[in-house]
Amino acid sequence: MSLLPTGTLILLVLFILVLITMTKNTSSLNVTKPVSAIAVLEGPVKGTVRFVEESSKVKISVDISGLKPNRKHGFHVHEAGDLTDGCTSACAHFNPFGTAHGGPDSKIRHVGDLGNILADKNGKAKYSFYDSMIKLRGKCNIIGRAIVVHADTDDLGLGGNAESLKTGNAGKRIGCAVIGYAKENFC
């Protein structure tokens, strides 16, 4: 006397076999390995921006030249990785929660609001910092989007006008690149 109908028993056995097969095929994947991404800017403003997961934050390493010396430049992740019309086709700041613009330490901000990068006397920005809002997987994933460098300083949403709450009054887009998976993820 069987406790389960034959058809149900067969389906249960098949389900268990599928689970075992899936477990064997994914056992070589290292899901705990941090994801890394890179954006390569080309043109008058050129260089690299690297993104690496570190615990609950993402480390952002900037190495960009061609900037105005001794000046802060707005620095944002924009929605689209589409650069068919230069930096203008990257759309608005990445803002999946529909919030107002702010600085990287603001409680209310776009996910893509990374504040400013500071150029040295030679027009170069080379340093690292961390952000806790951008991610390299999930809803706040920035891979496939664009990193954009602006001509002016981002006022971090404190400019007192509507444009400040939208863009930080950061001005013209002077450099951009699509953020893609870095080779460290694969080889």
UniProtKB/Swiss-Prot annotation:
Coiled-coil region list: none
UniProt binding sites for Zn(2+): 93, 101, 110, 113
Single GO molecular function: copper ion binding
InterPro entries: SOD-like_Cu/Zn_dom_sf (IPR036423), SOD_Cu/Zn_/chaperone (IPR024134), SOD_Cu/Zn_BS (IPR018152), SOD_Cu_Zn_dom (IPR001424)
Keywords: Antioxidant, Copper, Disulfide bond, Metal-binding, Oxidoreductase, Signal, Zinc
Catalytic activity: 2 superoxide + 2 H(+) = H2O2 + O2
Highest taxon listed in the record's lineage: Viruses
Signal peptide (residue range): 1-21
Positions of disulphide bridges: 87-176
Cofactor info, note text: Binds 1 copper ion per subunit. Binds 1 zinc ion per subunit.
Binding site for Cu cation: 76, 78, 93, 150
Protein EC: 1.15.1.1
Cofactor(s), names only, from the UniProt record: Cu cation; Zn(2+)
PANTHER family: SUPEROXIDE DISMUTASE CU-ZN -RELATED
Family the entry assigns: Belongs to the Cu-Zn superoxide dismutase family.
Record's function text: Destroys radicals which are normally produced within the cells and which are toxic to biological systems.
Protein name as catalogued: Superoxide dismutase [Cu-Zn]
UniProt source species: Paramecium bursaria Chlorella virus 1 (PBCV-1)
